[in-house]
Amino acid sequence: MTGFSNKAIVIDGRGHLLGRLAAVIAKVLLEGNKVVVVRCEQLNISGNFFRNKLKFMSFLRKRCNVNPARGPFHFRAPSKILWKTVRGMIPHKTERGKDALRRLRSYDGCPPPYDNRRRVVVPAALRVFCLKPGRKYCHVGRLSHEVGWKYREVVRKLEDKRKFKAVHKVAYERKLKKITKDAGAKVSKATAPFTAVIQSYGYN
């Protein structure tokens, strides 16, 4: 994930630890890259669910006594929780930090056009690499749902629909590939002289 690119890096959030992924994203954003994170509801947090919920409920009690509408603002959606975590790792009050934060997009589920884009993972932030087997962890989606996020079922339905379409698309592409291969084999004898001429010019 080194080097500058105008094309956005699409990260699949599933199975990553929230803080470690946010640290990597913050660094990449400050280098000038664009980052898109999908499936934020499947991010993980180390520690058992009960402790993490207590921490979040404590955070919900933080407010301005004079006028609570001034903030702090308590985001419930997993995509916004990731966004705010990244913001805390960026000098977001400077112009450089503001520009970096504008290059970040985070989504719950995997909306178009990113469902057809190649998605990457960050090995340094994967839970299976970072936590010892048997250590407790929880999902950001579950935490969000229990503190007021209303769209867990909607995102689940859309994800099921997307996965169903993806399976059928792969099956169709395999079938098409096989048909094309069989058709090529059938006409290979008839096209042999032409193929020889093409290959003599260095084309395969």
Swiss-Prot record:
Gene3D superfamilies: 6.10.250.3250, Ribosomal protein L13. One of its GO terms (molecular function) is structural constituent of ribosome. One of its GO terms (biological process) is translation. Pfam families: Ribosomal_L13. Keywords: Ribonucleoprotein, Ribosomal protein. Belongs to the universal ribosomal protein uL13 family. This is Large ribosomal subunit protein uL13. The gene is RpL13A.
